């Protein structure tokens, strides 16, 4: 197995856990990164699994999932990604001016940007850009379902697996184009 991560990156700024305890680990606004795990000695381009972390959209990190075993045993390139959480990822600032329209979708935009990077670069890591599956658990599963509804993401993945996802559908107060 070839593990490409050179060092653990910082997590996105986040809330405390459900019990109000501070979550350990270093945080930063400079937190958008990918971890890439690839099988060793692959003979052809491997399918790509993009994993989005859980954490109630308030905490979580790409570092929480080690894709090395999956990559080695299933001959798949595993990509874990960070996206902004809490207020940095999902707070709506549009009431402060039209320049902030869409601000409540920063976390989704982060995932779309990561998927664009994967499409453009994953072949360099042995991954097949024409065989990308998006997946996640808990809020990562909800993010997976959210990406199914984003026209700008349609060409960036080919399959989706949502694990333990909860989605609440309500009448939106405003429509945001993503």
Model-predicted regions and their roles:
Residues 1-9, 13-15, 167-178:
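Single conserved hydrophobic/aromatic residue that forms the stacking wall/gate
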Residues 7-10, 14-29:
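Aromatic- and Gly/Pro-rich amphipathic surface segment
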Residues 21-170, 174:
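Serine-hydrolase-like catalytic core of hydrolytic proteins
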């Amino acid at each position: 197995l070839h593990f490409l991560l050179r060092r653990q990156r910082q997590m996105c700024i986040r809330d405390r856990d459900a019990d109000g305890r501070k979550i350990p680990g270093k945080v930063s606004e400079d937190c958008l990164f990918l971890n890439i795990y690839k099988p060793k000695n692959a003979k052809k381009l491997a399918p790509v699994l993009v994993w989005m972390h859980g954490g109630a959209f308030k905490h979580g990190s790409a570092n929480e999932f080690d894709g090395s075993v999956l990559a080695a045993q299933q001959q798949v390139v595993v990509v874990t990604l960070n996206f902004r959480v809490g207020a940095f990822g999902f707070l709506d600032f549009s009431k402060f001016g039209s320049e902030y329209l869409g601000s409540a979708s920063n976390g989704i935009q982060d995932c779309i940007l990561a998927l664009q990077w994967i499409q453009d670069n994953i072949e360099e890591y042995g991954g097949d850009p024409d065989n990308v599956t998006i997946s996640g658990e808990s809020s990562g599963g909800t993010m997976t379902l959210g990406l199914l509804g984003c026209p700008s993401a349609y060409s960036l993945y080919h399959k989706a697996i949502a694990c333990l996802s909860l989605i609440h559908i309500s009448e939106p107060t405003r429509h945001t184009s993503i």
